[in-house]
UniProtKB/Swiss-Prot annotation:
HAMAP family cross-referenced by the UniProt entry: FdeH
Subcellular location: Cytoplasm
The keyword Cytoplasm is annotated on this UniProt entry: yes
Any one of the GO CC terms: cytosol
Function: Necessary for formate dehydrogenase activity.
Pfam families linked to this entry: FdhE_C, FdhE_central, FdhE_N
Gene3D superfamilies to which the protein is assigned, alphabetical: FdhE-like domain
Organism: Salmonella paratyphi A (strain AKU_12601)
Protein name: Protein FdhE
UniProt xrefs under NCBIfam families: FdhE, PRK03564.1
Amino acid sequence: MSIRIIPQDELGSSEKRTADMIPPLLFPRLKNVYNRRAERLRELAENNPLGDYLRFAALIAHAQEVVLYDHPLEMDLTARIKEANDQGKPPLDIHVLPRDKHWQKLLHSLIAELKPEMNGPALAVIENLEKASEQELEQMASALFASDFASVSSDKAPFIWAALSLYWAQMASLIPGKARAEYGEARQYCPVCGSMPVSSMVQIDTTQGLRYLHCNLCETEWHVVRVKCSNCEQSRDLHYWSLENEQAAVKAESCGDCGTYLKILYQEKDPKVEAVADDLASLVLDARMEQEGFARSSINPFLFPGEGE
């Protein structure tokens, strides 16, 4: 199954009703998303061996919230949606969508917001980014989108990605239209931008019991049925791992067919779980999965692979 975004004026009345039954896509609702992430990161930092880094990530998330409202984005994406729909491509495809200078404005605002909170190596990193040329910043952005992580140091990547993520999330929140699920290409990548998931979540409320993958870039969530590998769509050899017990709110879903795993979070076990924060706070589970021979099929926006990984 794949997910395609249909312009609003091309949806018939029956399709509109169907699209409202099980939403294939949940576009980002940006109000307080970064503050909630920052709060969860600070909460999870207590008694966590990674506490210092979780608090560092919380500072970036809080800065994203501030910059989001300081630099709103106005953009008409109607033509872009129709063009992408005709081409069968994600409307905000990271591999083809031209970037304007808005994202660099966001980056410099993030740096200004974070400088008073940083010291030592972290301060040196953002000061280095502050001095980088527009061309150098674009090269780093292109490398990250191409998964060329060896070309961008792992200490710079979270700051670059934080600005790109803000930009793409702002655009995704402005998309006009509905989404429709249809048979086609596998959907292990975000249908809006083509980036990777950070984790998946079994939700409560109006989407009770449904699993959605959460994009690590544009914050969109897309529906993938449970008990199916989100990477290869097989269901023959799935296993669920946790560091606690069967009632754990954070588990890893491994697939013996493709040899990968993805975290799955359960809101019914803990309503406060957050896609990015809880994934980052459970790196001990990642270490266990690596010991078992599984490769991660996702990337956390605060933890990028280094050279040689």
